[in-house]
Amino acid sequence: MRIIAGAFKGRALAAVGKGDAGAHLRPTTDRVRENLFNILSGGRFDINIDGARVLDLFAGTGALGLEALSRGAAHLTCVDTGRKSLDLIRQNIAICGAKDQVKILKCDATRLSKNGDAPFNLIFLDPPYKKSMGERAIALALAGGWIADDALIIWEEGQDIVVPAELSLIDTRKYGDSRAYFLTRS
């Protein structure tokens, strides 16, 4: 796993090893991550990564959020509870030298409380597949003020999702057994 483009381009991220089977640690592949960011930078969606506030729910290794930082995002908040995930996120932040731009929240994304900071305009949601955790996490993020009105949400899942009434599905991409859903606020 590596950072694909931007200020941290080419940096090899910490090896996942055996991962964390209990937490279903399943990093987004370099190929899928590159494709997602090509879509984001292609101008189809009304999002500017440069200066963005990024929220990475079920952050895993933090690679999606760190890729956004590498490409000009101003801030990243990673949310995860897995011990192995949190260790990998910390290692990857150090590899990228991004400590001052990243906040780590050790909390369950399906139990988010109210956001005390500014809302986020780029959200990555990559819950364990086939656990139906994404719906709960996104509902709490919406209710808790985590998601800005102009936000773009990229939700990676291994099954069909239930799109909350407050959101609109604007695109779907399929990558093997996973799908990336692109959503905005309605």
Mark where each language-model region is:
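Class I S-adenosyl-L-methionine-dependent methyltransferase catalytic core
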Residues: 1-186
